[in-house]
Structures are given as C-alpha cells and as structure tokens.
C-alpha cells in the first residue's frame, strides 16, 4: 500500500500540474470521449492519458496498448511510488511524475485523471500491473471466481462483495437513507455521498453555498486533507471508475460513487478554493491550467481539478464512464480481462466492471484502497497533493472517507439494485447512446444520464450537480457538454462567477438557478439564442431551459433542485421538487418521479424513471419532471427522433404529458396555462416564456422546441389564454399547430400571438371557432398529443416533423442544434419577426384564415378588428385557438373547423375576401414575415414564413379568395378552385374571385385536399358546401379532387379537412394562407408559412419577386404583395432553403400562391405560374418552385435548416399530412391554379384561368425559378445535375433535364420519406404525375402549370376547365410536384388510384379536370413535395430534397420526362396543354433553360402532357402526390419529385406512390398509369397517356409518357424510374407552339404513346445512372 500512499499524493500533485497541460488535458478529455485524442494524450502523458481515453473509448485495447508504452515509463516513476502496487495507485504513475510534473504537467494534465483511470486499468491490463504490485494480484486472478458469473476476483473479499451483486444481499443499510449496500465501503461512500449529500443539501440549501462547502468543509476543515483525501479517493475512485468501465454495470455506479465521493471532495476544494489553491500552489501550473482547462474540454479541467478536488476527477471519471458506457457492454469483457489479468488487486473493480455488482465490490475495494491510500497514501497526499496538513487531511480523509464510503456503498448498493438489473444495464447503454447522439445534452445527459443511474442518486445529485449547473448555466448550451465536465474547471477557471457557484455546492447555484430562472425568461431569448447554438433539441433545452436543467442536473441536488424549480418554477411541481431534494433526495425523487409519472412523462419514461430513481430524480425528475422531462419529451416529440427513449417518452409521455400538460394548461386556466406555458417556455424556451408576448416567440420556440410541449404549450397558449398565444398556437396550429412540431408555431404564435395579443383576446370569440375548432381540434390535439400517433395526419406530421425536425426541425433534429436551442433561437428570431409579423403572418394565414373564418363567421370581426381582417382573422383564428384552450385542438379546429367556418363565412367569403382585408393586412404580415422570414430562423422555423403573409397579399389580388387560397394550400386549392370556379372562365376573375374566394376558401379548405381543385372551381360556387365538406371530408378531398368539379368542392371540402386535417381546412377557412398555414402550418412552416405567407418556401424567396409578380397578375399581384412578405417568410424558409431565387419573381407569386397554399403548392399555382409562362407568370416562380422551394430549399439550408426548415417545410409537407389528404398539398394544387389565376389573366385566358393560369405562369416562372429555388430545396432538377433524383431511376436526364424531371420524380420518390407523415395522400399525387405534359418541353409552361399544379388538387378541376394551358402548367407542375409525400398514403391511395388509370378523356380532364388535376397535383405535390422535402429531411429516407430535385429535374426535364421516381412516373405523357398562349413560355424558356432544358424552352407552351398532367395532376395531385414532374420538366420533376418525395415520405412507402394512378379519372383521364400499386409502381412505368387534350384549347396533348418506373416500392427513396418515362408529351398547342420534342435516347426505353392526337411527342429519356449521383447528392443535402 506504499504505492497507494504516494499515489494518493502523487495524483493530486500531478493533477495540479495536469492543469498546465490543459491543452493536452483538453484533448485528453475529448480524446477520452472521442478516443481520437487518446493517442494525442498518450505522448504527452506518456501513454497514461491515452489509456484513460482508451479506457473511455476503447478501454481494453487502447488501454492495454497505451499502458505498456506509457505506463512502463511511468512504472519506473511509479515504481518508487507504487510500492503498495494498489490498483488505485496506478495513479501513482501519474502522481509519480509529480517531480517531472511541471514538465509532464504540460503533457499529463489530462493524464492525471487519465492516470487515475489508467492507473486502475493500466495496472490491470498493461505491464503496469506486473510492473507495480499488480503482478502478484494478477497472479491471484482466477483464484476467486464468481460461481455465478465466473468473474475473477483478486480477493475473497472482493468475491464476497461481488457475489452479493448476484444474490442481492445488502448487509450494509444506511439508516439515514434507508438504503442497504452490498459492501461497507459502499455504505461509507454512500454516507459520504448520499447521506452527506442530503445533509449537505439541506445545509447547502439552508446555508446557500456554505452548506455544501461546509459539509465538505468538515472534510474541508482540513482543506489539503479533504482534497488529498478527495484526490486519494478520487484516484481510487478513478481507478474504480477505470475498472468500472471494465464492467458496464458496475462501472457506472462506481463512477457515481467516485463522482459522489469526488464530488464531496470537490466541494471541499470547491468550498475551500484554498484546497484547490493549495494543490495548485503545489503545482503552480494548475492554476493557469485551470483557466486553460476551463477553455479546454471539461475533461482536462476535471483532471486538473482532480488533484485539486476529487470532484473534477469524479466528473472526469464520470465523463470517462459516460464515454465508456456506449461500449460498456462490450468493454466489460475486455475490461474484465484486463482487470483479471492486471487488476492491481482490484478485480473487485474488475468485479465492479462485471456488469451487475461490480460497482459494489470495486467501490468497496476502492474504498478500502482509498482507506489504505489514505492510510498509506494519506501522508503522500498531504505532501504530494498539497504537501500540507497531511495529518489533518488524513484524519479528515479518514472520516470523510468513511462517510464517503458509506455513502458510496449505499449509493452503489442502491445503484446496483438498479444497475445490477439487466434492464438497467441495457438501459444505460441505450441512454448513453442517446446521450452520445447528443440527444439532449451530450454533456449533461451524457454525463448525468450515465451518472444518473449511479451518480445522481447520492453524490452526484448534490455535488456534481453543483458544478454541472454552474457550468451549464454559465456555458452556452452548445458548450453544455464541456461545461458539465468543465463544471468545476470551467466555473473555476473560466467563470469566476461560476466558480463560486460551482464551489458552493448547491446554494449559490440554487440561488443562481433561481436567478437564472428569472433571467431565463428574459434569457429565454438568450437561451433560445443559445439554443440554436446547439442543434440538438436536448442540448438546446438543456442549454436554454436546461440551462438550468443541465446545470441543475450537474449541480448539487439542492442547486439542481432549485434550478429545476427555477426552470419548473412555472410548473410548480419541479420547484417543489427542487426544494424538496435538498431535504429528502429519495423522497424528492419519488415525488418528482410521481410528478413525472403524473405528467405523463412517467409513461414515456417508466424504465428510465426507475433508473432515475437511482440517480437523482431531482435531476431528472424534479428537473425532468417538469422541466427536464419536458425538455426531453419535447425533444422526443421534437425533431429528436434519435432518442428512442425520448421518443417513447414522447409517444407515451408526450401523449400523456401532452394531454396532461394540456390539462394542466386547461386546468390551470388561461392564466395558469399561460403561466404554464411560460413555464413550458421556461422549460422549452427558458427565457422566452417570461415575455408574455415576447414570450410567445419563446412560446413558439417552446412549442417548436418541444413538440410535446408544444401540444401542451399550445394548450397552454390556448388556455394560456393568450388568445394570441392560442392564436399563435392556433396559427401555429394552423400554421403553428404544425408549428408546435415544427416550431412554425413560434412565429405564428409570436406574430399572431404577439400581434394578436391585443385582439387575440377579442378573437377569443374564437370560441366560435372554438366550437368548430373543437371538433377538428380533436384531430390535431390527438395527433399532436400523440406526437407520432398520427391521430391526425396533420398533427402527426407535425409531431413527426417536430420530432424529426426538432427533429427538424430533427430537426432534428440540427435542430441540429438542439432543436430546443435552435428553436429557441428561432423563436427569438421569430420573436423578432413575429412581432411585426405576428398578426400579419400568422393571422393572415392561420388567424386570418380563422379570422377570415371568424371574420366570415363573425363577419364583423375583421372589420371589428381593423387590424384588420387580418387581425380579425387572426382574432378569429386566435379565438379559435384561444377558445381551443387545447390549442392543438384549437389549431386543428381552427384549421379544420376553420374551413367549415370559413366555408360558412367563406361563402360570406365574399366578406371573407373583404375580410381578406386580412389579405391586405397580410401584406403587412408579409412585411413582418419578411422581417420575420429574414429574422426567422431560416431553419425550422421558416415555417413561420408561410404565415399567410404572402397569402394575404395573394388574397389581395385575389381578394379574399387569394387570401383564402393563400390561406392554405388546402385553402388555396379551394381558393384556386374557387378561383377557378369563380374565375374559371375568367382566369383573373378568381383574383377578384372574392365570391369564389369565400366559396373557395371553403372550397379550398375543403378542397385543399385533392378534390379541392375541382371543388375549388366549383367550390367557389359550392363555397359553403365546400367549407363544410372540406372540413368533413378532407380525406375524400384527395379523391374528391378528381371528383366532379361541382361536387368536388363539397367532396373536396370533406377531404380537405382530412388532408389538411386542420390546416388545409383552416387554410381554406377564412384565410387560405392561414388555413394553409394551419395546413401547412400543420406542416408547420409549410402550412403556416405556406398558408400565411408565401413564406412557404418559395414564397419567401419571392419576396422581391412578388412585387413583380403582383403586377403581373391581378391575382398574382396580390400574391406578389404577399409574396414579398411571403418571400420574406418563405424567404425565411426558402431563403433558408435555398431561395431558388431565380425563381423569385415568379416565385413570389408562386411563393404567395404556394405560401398561400402550402407555399410550395401555393407557389406552384401562384400567380407566377400563370405569369411566368405568361406575362403574369413572369415574376412568379412556380408553385413548383414552391414545392421545390420546399424541396429545393432543403438542399440549400437543407440538413440543418432542412431539419428545421425542412421540417417546417415538411410540415407544409406536413402536409405530408397535408399531402396525406393531399388536401393541403392538393390544396396547394388548388392554389396552383389560384396563383396561376392570379398569375395571368392573360394566362388565365390562356389557361382559362383554370388553376393553371396562375399555375402555369407560375409554373413557368417557377420553372426557372424553380430551377433556381428548387435546387436549393429539392435540388430541383432545374438545371442542376444535382437533381436529387432521389428516387429517380432515371438518374440522369439523358437528354435534358427531362432526366431532371425524372430525377425530380425520383425526388418525389424520395418523398416517401414524407409519406409516412402523410401517407394517405400519395395516391392522389400519382395521377398528377402521370399527368405530366407530354411535351415536357412545354413543360416549361407545363412546369409552370405543373408547379401550379400542385394546387391542382384543389383547383385543377376548376382551372382545368377553361384553362387548358393553365391546367397544363398546373398539371405539369402538379406532376412535377406530384409528391409521393405521403408515400404510405400515397401508396395506399396509389393502390386505389393506381388502378384508376385516369381515363384519357381529354375532354373530361382535357379542360378543367386536367388542369384542375394539374393544379391540384402540382400544388399538392408541391405541398407534398415540400412536405416531402421536409419530411424527407426529417426522415432520412425521404430525402425531401428528392422531391425538390425531382421538381427541378422536372423543370429541366420538362414535361417530356415526367419521370416518376415513383412507379407512377408521369404517364401523363400528354397533357394537351391547351396553352395556346403557352407560346408565352418565356418562363418556360427559363424553366427549360434553367432546367438545363434539354427540352426546347418554347417547345410546348401548352403541354398536352401538362394538361393531361393537369387533369391527372389534379387527380394525382391529390392522389399521386401531385406529380408535377410530368407537367413540367421543372415543375413536373420538382413536383413529381416532391410528390414523390412527399409521397414516399416513407422511402419505401412513398415509392409506392408509384401508383401513378390518377385517383380520379376525372382529373386526369389520361393518366394511364399502370400503377402497380404503391409498391408495384416500382417497376411499372406509368404509361400515362394523358390524352388530356383540351379540346377547348384545340390542342390536345397526346403526350404519352411511358414511364417504366421501377418503383422501388419499398425503397421509396431510390425509386428510380426505371425507364424514365419517355415522355412523349405531345402537345399540340392551339398555337402550334412546337412543344419541343426532346429527343432523348430513352435510357429506359420510354414507351412513346401518342394519346389521341398527340401532335408532338416529346420523348424524354432519363438516364438513371448518370443522374443518380447528383440526385443522391441532392438527397444527401
């Protein structure tokens, strides 16, 4: 034991020097976790540090390797010191270098800790064992074998203790804690940790910083000694930890004990900095090292501190343990081997290494060794560490050690009880894995998760927590991990302020935590700011709300508790818990745990809680109960899908918690809810909460951050009364409901809530909505609550999105700053914008829609609230939301009911249009959005962008109608339909189509689904009916679209609701955007942004363009108006996304349209659709772009933003849900035409305004812009080879971007990822796809149309009618956007629709239908696509980009190749685009050009295929997911890609969408897609002969696209269109505008089929191979 003596002192000394090697230490610390630094440290530490690192990373191999080289040199050094050869004293080598310390110090700073850990293992495994006294002990290996597990114990005592782990015997009870331990040493440790912790905690809380310090003070009474002892113990502990790593089960507990003990020791030094200083004095470098350490990774700091204080070491060890944990299971054997071979007598440690009880024995041994060390090493530590007060220290250490050992023993026993469980063993690694994933806070979760199990229980709670919180608090969340480990060092060295807190075991930080609590509210913004720093939701939350939480957890229990209380101050329970823990950790834990369970988190985290029980539940439960749990749950709900436990928690916990929270919110009452929400914010946003209205942003962030919470937040908001909040929620619900998931809500809430604050209350009348909302609400709430329940596609998608995004957001996710952080930041940003945008963005889209609904319902409301209609709308929405205390429900209701309401008011929609002053306001919103968008976190929260701002403006041109269209994709389709209906004959009429608008609003709402397009048309007429139906049959909507135009409205209405779920419907509702926002909002950003502003994606981008657009189309103009805003908003999103700006001009409209609708859809059919191709269309990017914008943006901002934005987009794709119903997407489709309607009166004329007019122009505009925008988002095939052909078989457009199209299509395939979100919609898309214009060349126009087409679902039918061209454009767009978004659904529907080869009744779809289809399809697709993109991002498989890509390709590809990555390639080869005016394919040119148009730009002004596509699109838009691809190379590809992406939301599922079956023949008769069903689509090419020739146009495109699209049925993602469809888009433009026949060697023999009168066939051949990579790239992005 001589060695131990020197070892004890030596390590401190060494540790002291260690600080100097802070850099090495830092690397070491990092290396430890990463294992990369191991080698780095190795040289510096002479191999010691590396072993440590290795111990953590690869304890067995590396350790072994390192020790021999590194340790042997030490062996000589250690030899003298390590006479005792105690295992713990392998640290001796580290200590030994004390002399060389200064020199070595530079290197071994990390080694100190490393050495401690290494000391244990090295002695065990390397030559050190033999070199030191280990050999003898090693020789004993095998002597004492455990009869149960065969573990080799060096000593009988060890074996005895080890056996207890098997038998469960716990002969050493702790009277104080009532815990029995297997070993006396554990009991001692426990006393030192748990009992002392409790006492210390009590005293600490009572004394403040003094308590913990005093407790330690007892030990600190002999500062050097406690320190020495702490070090000695630490070293022993380190060894224990090292060995413990050997056994995963034991390792953690041992670590916990070590940590606890160390923590105790640390507090000693902490309380008495003198202690630290003394050692530091001994090793002057330590002081500098500390500062360095603070800078450096936590690991080094703890190492530095380890000499100074056991706590740092403990932290380090913990760290190591956490690091090791991941491979703990594997390591144990190796460790065991090591331990067995060279355990330096600590086979007990090896024992401890043994999974279950190893901790006890090792700890006991450790304790014994510590005692020995103290006895023998006590003097050493005195001189070695501080060289002073060895006797006093020794005495103090003895007592301390005894207590510590008791505590540790108890702790270990308790932990073992947990740890020994196989369950716990399994759990721990899982947790670690999650932590490692950076789920919550790598540092905190990572550390305390692992520690939780053991550390938190006793020592950790009090001590570690103290440092942890400080570190967390002071360090940004992103630094959270380092902070945690840094906690002491960072606090000590980096943050002096922190240091006292850190040192003060709990109270300082407790108070600090409270202080933080207060600051947190304000700080929430900061927190949010910080949060964004951390992509992960967990870290963000930990950082922000978890700023306290992480800090809390790490800090001493009191501190943690208090902090938790601070965080959970709002919730209250946590606070109580926080306070309680000081007194009774166990009781507190229990209470906290119970509270947790009550919260519903228990359900999600039952097992975890049990584990939590072991580790301080105060940390997890008190903090986690309200805060921590919430955070994690939110994370789970959020983008963070990575954390299964969390997800589970979210699933059950969230559902429980959500409802509970909702209940709490409800119970709390408005105010309480508000408070609660604030707490949530606190939890989520930390600082956001404080600001009531500022808070909303936080709130939003909160919502976003914690989808789970968002549900409750929403509820809170609703209850919170803050109508604004509610509205925010509602808005978000509409736009934010998704938002909750996405975080779109943030903006919505903030803007809505904020702006609406005042009138949110008035909107309280929203009860009106409330009632309505109530009905729908269930849908949202459920899904939302469910998180993954998918009770409502919308909600589900939202949740999913949130999870993903967040997780999205995951994130997401990404997120991934922690979604929390990111979201918070976003929220902050949003906050910025929200305030301006609030009403405008949110209200316009969501509130406005509701307002519009409300307004319409409460007609006076809009007027009442001048703020407008917008305000009114918002009010309404808000009231809706407000009334729906269950904001989620409200949101749903708003969305859903909204549509109904809207339906009613919509009819009054005329008033609604007036209301749509809201629209006017929306422009303001757009401005706000603009700011918002810019401000708004481009990422996840971009969703906010679509806050109907743009849509509002859009509505301006459209009048209410556009607003309505804007309202949501869903709404839009209706709107579009309405437009179409209204302006069917009069393309522009729709713009003024206030009348239709109302109807449309309803229609849109209803129509949003697929049907809406037709319905929209008729819906305008059916307005009221539609509203009703929309709300009712959203699902039907999807099919409806193809249904009769007249009925469709109603039918659509029904489907829209389902599709939009809430948002579409709501979009339709008063504010299309709003609803759409809801819809898209559902999709979160999408609906919200989409709905409200053009924000959805493209719209944002179009900020600038919209103005241009605005002029272009009356409708367009308005669109543009909003567009600018929209662009801003979308910009946020789009910008974030990629701002496919080339498309901006058209885009704005597109964006507007899209935004209005689903942004993507909206865009598609946005004005520019008509405009670009046509004058009006010129500025507008297409809806396609919108789609792409959603999809394409992904690439640009993609991953990170993709997660966030993407998710947001996805929400629009939530639309997945949207798409699912396709209502939203369809709605988008509707919008498509709407936009087009706006986009081109001329276009309308050209297109007859069927949705396509705007769409088409939009489409056209979109094409180029799409190309620009898409790429960033979906990697539109636009011209970029990156065409993200995610699923496209024809990887490359051989010829031109037909391949692009294909790729888009592939993208669409990729959509499947989204599909899962909104699976049900996929089929609808299908039709669209096939609808692809035969002459994709014309696809330009087709593309435009197609892009518009996304709206086709809603409006294709209507637009289709007269506006062949438009339809064509729409179709194309639709095709392009045809999104497999709801892959699953799509697949499902595909099956339905697959069968349904749309009859090639040119006449039938030839007109309206086709167009309608196209529009719907396009829009839907866009929606879907966007969604898909977003979804994709969230869903890796989805490759949301895919969609964009497809669309891009579509662009490039043009209609000719409407490759459907999905099996349903657009067979709509022909869309008799009756674009006589298609000649005005200026846009087309661009699109083509941009698309790298192989296809002649001018080629087909009218894409027959496009038209066909339109028809089909309409059909498919809904069904197939709006394959825009067909329609336009750009659009088509994009749309299709998007659709595909969307549809294939599930890679595999989505692919199924391959069904290329136009759900409704009506829409696209020509889609003769032999969809072999979702899956079968894989191989079957869609032979869609879209003989959609619009007789009216005189040109019927007989384009036949035989696309052998081998659907990768299951591989939705890579569904390559096997033979890209040869798109023989034969477009016989009325004007013989030669559709360029793109002669492409059909890589896959494309079946040319001329459908009736296919004048020109554009044969597009896609080369799968070539493009694949690019596609893939896109996908990757």
From Swiss-Prot:
Statement: the UniProt record of this protein carries the keyword Metal-binding: yes
Compositionally biased spans, kind Basic and acidic residues: 216-232, 325-341, 517-526, 674-684, 707-727, 813-834, 1649-1662
Biased composition (Low complexity): 880-894, 905-919, 1153-1170
Residue segments, region Disordered: 1-43, 193-250, 270-398, 516-557, 663-931, 950-1062, 1100-1119, 1137-1176, 1216-1243, 1510-1597, 1620-1677
Comp. bias regions, Gly residues: 376-385
Family matches, as Gene3D superfamilies: Classic Zinc Finger
Feature: compositional bias, Polar residues: 1518-1531
Keyword annotations from UniProtKB, A to Z: Coiled coil, Metal-binding, Repeat, Zinc, Zinc-finger
Start-end of C2H2-type zinc fingers: 144-166, 172-196
GO molecular function, one term: zinc ion binding
Domain of life: Eukaryota
Keyword Magnesium carried by entry: no
Record's compositionally biased regions (Pro residues): 1-26
Coiled-coil residue windows: 391-423
InterPro entries per record: Znf_C2H2_sf, Znf_C2H2_type
Name the UniProt record assigns to this protein: Zinc finger protein 831
The species this protein was found in: Homo sapiens (Human)
């Amino acid at each position: 034991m001589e060695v131990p003596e020197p070892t004890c002192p030596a390590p401190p000394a060494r540790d002291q020097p260690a600080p100097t090697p802070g850099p090495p230490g830092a690397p070491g610390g990092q290396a430890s976790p990463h294992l990369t630094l191991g080698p780095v440290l190795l040289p510096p530490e002479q191999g010691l540090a590396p072993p440590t690192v290795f111990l953590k990373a690869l304890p067995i191999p590396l350790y072994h390797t390192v020790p021999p080289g590194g340790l042997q040199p030490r062996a000589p050094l250690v030899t003298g010191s390590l006479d005792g050869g105690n295992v713990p004293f392998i640290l001796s080598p580290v200590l030994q270098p004390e002399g060389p310390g200064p020199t070595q110090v530079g290197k071994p700073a990390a080694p100190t800790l490393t050495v401690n850990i290494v000391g244990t293992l090295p002695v065990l495994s390397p030559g050190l064992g033999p070199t030191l006294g280990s050999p003898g002990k090693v020789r004993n290996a095998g002597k004492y074998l455990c009869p149960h597990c065969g573990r080799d114990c060096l000593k009988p005592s060890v074996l005895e203790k080890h056996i207890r782990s098997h038998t469960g015997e716990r002969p050493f009870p702790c009277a104080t804690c009532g815990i029995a331990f297997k070993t006396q040493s554990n009991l001692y440790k426990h006393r030192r940790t748990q009992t002392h912790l409790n006492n210390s905690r009590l005293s600490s809380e009572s004394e403040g910083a003094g308590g913990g310090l005093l407790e330690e003070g007892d030990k600190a009474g002999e500062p050097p000694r406690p320190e020495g002892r702490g070090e000695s113990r630490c070293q022993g502990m380190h060894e224990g930890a090292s060995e413990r790593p050997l056994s995963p089960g034991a390792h953690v507990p041992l670590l916990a004990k070590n940590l606890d003990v160390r923590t105790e020791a640390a507090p000693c030094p902490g309380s008495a900095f003198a202690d630290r200083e003394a050692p530091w004095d001994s090793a002057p470098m330590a002081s500098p090292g500390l500062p360095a350490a603070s800078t450096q990774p936590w690991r080094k700091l703890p190492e530095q501190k380890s000499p100074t204080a056991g706590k740092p070491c403990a932290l380090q060890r913990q760290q190591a343990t956490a690091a090791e944990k991941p491979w703990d299971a594997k390591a144990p054997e190796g460790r065991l081997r090591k331990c067995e071979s060279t355990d330096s007598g600590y086979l007990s440690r090896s024992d401890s290494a043994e999974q279950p009880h190893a901790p006890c024995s090792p700890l006991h041994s450790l304790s014994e060794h510590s005692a020995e060390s103290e006895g023998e090493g006590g003097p050493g530590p005195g001189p070695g560490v501080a060289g002073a007060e060895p006797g006093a220290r020794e005495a103090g250490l003895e007592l301390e050690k005894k207590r510590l050992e008791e505590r540790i023993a108890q702790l270990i026993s308790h932990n073992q009880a947990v740890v020994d469980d196989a369950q716990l063993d399994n759990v721990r690694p899982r947790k670690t894995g999650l932590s490692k994933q950076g789920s919550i806070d790598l540092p905190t979760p990572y550390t305390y998760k692992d520690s939780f199990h053991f550390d938190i229980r006793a020592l950790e709670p009090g001590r570690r927590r103290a440092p942890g919180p400080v570190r967390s608090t002071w360090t940004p969340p992103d630094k959270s991990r380092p902070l945690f480990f840094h906690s002491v060092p960072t606090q000590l060295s980096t943050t002096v302020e922190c240091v006292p807190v850190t040192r003060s075991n709990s109270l300082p930080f407790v108070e600090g935590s409270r202080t933080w609590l207060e600051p947190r509210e304000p700080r929430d913004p900061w927190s949010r700011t910080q949060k964004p720093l951390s992509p992960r939701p967990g870290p963000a939350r930990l950082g922000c709300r978890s700023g306290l939480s992480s800090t809390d957890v790490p800090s001493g229990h009191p501190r943690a508790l208090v902090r938790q209380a601070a965080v959970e101050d709002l919730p209250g329970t946590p606070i109580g818990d926080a306070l309680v823990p000081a007194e009774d950790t166990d009781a507190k834990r229990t209470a906290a745990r119970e509270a947790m369970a009550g919260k519903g988190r228990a359900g999600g985290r039952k097992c975890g809680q049990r584990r939590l029980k072991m580790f301080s539940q105060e940390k997890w439960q008190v903090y986690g109960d309200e805060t921590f749990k919430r955070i994690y749950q939110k994370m789970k709900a959020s983008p963070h899908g990575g954390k299964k436990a969390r997800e589970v928690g979210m699933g059950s916990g969230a559902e429980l918690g959500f409802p509970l929270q909702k209940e709490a919110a409800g119970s709390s009452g408005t105010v309480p809810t508000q408070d609660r929400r604030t707490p949530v914010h606190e939890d989520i946003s930390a600082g956001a909460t404080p600001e009531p209205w500022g808070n909303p942003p936080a709130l939003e962030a909160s919502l976003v951050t914690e989808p789970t919470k968002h549900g409750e937040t929403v509820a809170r908001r609703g209850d919170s009364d803050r109508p604004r909040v509610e509205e925010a929620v509602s808005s978000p619900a509409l736009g934010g409901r998704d938002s909750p998931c996405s975080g779109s809500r943030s903006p919505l809430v903030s803007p809505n809530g904020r702006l609406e604050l005042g009138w949110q209350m008035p909107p309280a009348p929203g009860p009106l909505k409330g009632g309505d909302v109530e009905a729908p609400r269930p849908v949202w709430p459920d899904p939302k609550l469910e998180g993954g329940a998918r009770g409502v596609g919308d909600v589900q998608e939202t949740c999913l999105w949130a999870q993903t995004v967040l997780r999205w957001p995951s994130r997401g996710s990404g997120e991934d700053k922690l979604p929390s952080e990111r979201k918070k930041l976003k929220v902050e940003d949003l906050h910025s914008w929200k305030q301006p945008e609030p009403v405008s963005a949110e209200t316009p889209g969501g509130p406005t829609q509701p307002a519009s609904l409300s307004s319409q319902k409460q007609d006076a409301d809009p007027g009442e609230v001048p703020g407008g209609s917008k305000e009114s709308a918002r009010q309404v929405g808000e009231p809706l939301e407000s009334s729906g205390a269950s904001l989620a429900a409200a949101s749903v209701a708003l969305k859903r009911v909204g549509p109904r309401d809207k339906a009613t008011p919509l009819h009054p929609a005329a008033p609604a249009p007036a209301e749509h002053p809201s629209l006017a306001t929306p422009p303001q919103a757009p401005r706000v959005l603009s700011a918002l968008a810019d401000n708004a976190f481009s990422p996840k929260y971009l969703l906010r962008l679509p806050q109907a701002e743009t849509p509002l403006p859009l509505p301006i041109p459209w009048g209410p109608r556009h607003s309505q269209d804007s309202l949501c994709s869903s709404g839009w389709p209706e709107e579009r339909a309405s437009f179409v209906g209204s302006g069917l004959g009069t393309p522009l009429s729709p713009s003024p189509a206030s009348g239709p608008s109302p109807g449309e609003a309803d229609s849109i709402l209803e129509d949003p689904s697929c049907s809406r397009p037709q319905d929209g048309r008729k819906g305008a007429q059916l307005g009221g009916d539609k509203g009703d139906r929309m709300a009712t049959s959203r699902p039907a909507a999807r099919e409806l679209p193809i249904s009769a135009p007249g009925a469709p409205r109603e039918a659509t209405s029904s489907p829209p609701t389902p599709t939009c779920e809430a948002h579409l419907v709501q979009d339709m509702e008063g504010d299309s955007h709003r609803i759409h926002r809801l819809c898209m909002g559902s999709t979160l950003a999408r609906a919200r942004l989409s709905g409200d502003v053009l924000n959805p994606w493209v719209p944002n981008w179009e900020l600038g363009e919209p103005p241009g657009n605005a002029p272009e189309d009356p409708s367009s103009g308005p669109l543009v108006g909003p567009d600018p805003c929209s662009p801003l908003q979308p910009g946020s999103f789009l910008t974030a996304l990629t701002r496919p700006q080339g498309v901006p001009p058209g885009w704005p409209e597109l964006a507007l349209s899209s935004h209005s609708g689903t942004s993507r859809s909206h865009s598609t059919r946005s004005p520019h659709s008509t405009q670009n191709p046509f004058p009006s269309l010129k500025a507008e990017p297409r809806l396609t772009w919108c789609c792409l914008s959603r999809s394409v943006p992904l690439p640009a901002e993609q991953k990170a933003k993709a997660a966030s934005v993407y998710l947001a987009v996805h929400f629009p794709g939530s639309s997945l849900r949207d798409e699912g119903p396709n209502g939203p997407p369809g709605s988008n489709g509707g919008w498509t035409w709407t936009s087009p309607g706006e986009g081109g009166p001329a276009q309308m004329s050209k297109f007859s305004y069927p949705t396509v007019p705007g769409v088409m122009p939009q489409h056209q505009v979109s094409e180029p812009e799409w190309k620009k925008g898409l790429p960033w988002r979906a990697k539109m095939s636009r011209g970029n080879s990156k065409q993200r052909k995610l699923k496209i078989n024809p990887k490359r457009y051989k010829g031109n971007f037909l391949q692009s199209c294909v790729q888009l299509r592939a993208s669409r395939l990729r959509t499947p990822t989204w599909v899962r979100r909104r699976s049900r919609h996929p089929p609808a898309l299908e039709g669209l796809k096939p609808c692809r214009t035969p002459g994709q060349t014309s696809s330009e126009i087709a593309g435009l149309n197609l892009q518009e087409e996304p709206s086709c679902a809603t409006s294709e039918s209507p637009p289709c009618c007269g506006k062949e061209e438009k339809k064509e454009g729409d179709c194309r767009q639709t095709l392009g956007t045809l999104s497999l978004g709801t892959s699953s659904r799509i697949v499902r529907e595909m099956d339905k629709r697959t069968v349904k080869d749309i009859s090639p009744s040119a006449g039938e779809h030839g007109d309206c239908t086709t167009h309608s289809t196209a529009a719907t399809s396009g829009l839907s697709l866009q929606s879907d696509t966007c969604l898909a993109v977003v979804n994709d991002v969230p869903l890796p498989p989805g490759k949301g980009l895919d969609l964009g890509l497809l669309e891009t390709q579509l662009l490039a590809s043009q209609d000719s190749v409407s490759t459907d990555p999905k099996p349903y390639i657009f067979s709509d080869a022909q869309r008799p685009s009756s674009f006589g005016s298609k000649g005005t394919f200026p846009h087309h040119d661009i699109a083509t050009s941009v698309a790298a148009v192989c296809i002649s730009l001018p080629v087909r002004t009218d894409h027959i295929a496009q038209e066909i596509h339109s028809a089909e699109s309409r059909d498919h838009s809904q069904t197939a997911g709006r394959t825009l691809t067909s329609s336009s190379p750009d659009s088509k590809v994009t749309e299709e890609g998007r659709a595909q992406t969307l549809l294939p939301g599930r890679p595999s599922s989505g692919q199924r969408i391959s069904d290329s079956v136009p759900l409704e023949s009506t829409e696209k008769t020509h889609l003769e897609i032999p969809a072999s069903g979702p899956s079968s689509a894989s191989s079957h090419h869609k032979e869609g002969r879209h003989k959609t020739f619009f007789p009216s146009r005189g040109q019927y495109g007989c384009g036949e696209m035989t696309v052998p699209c081998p659907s990768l049925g299951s591989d939705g993602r890579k569904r390559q269109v096997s033979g890209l469809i040869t798109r023989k888009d034969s477009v016989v433009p009325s004007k013989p505008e030669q559709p360029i026949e793109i002669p492409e060697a059909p890589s896959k023999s494309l079946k040319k089929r001329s459908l009736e009168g296919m004048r020109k066939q554009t044969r597009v051949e896609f080369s799968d191979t070539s493009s694949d990579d690019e596609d893939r790239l896109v996908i990757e992005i």
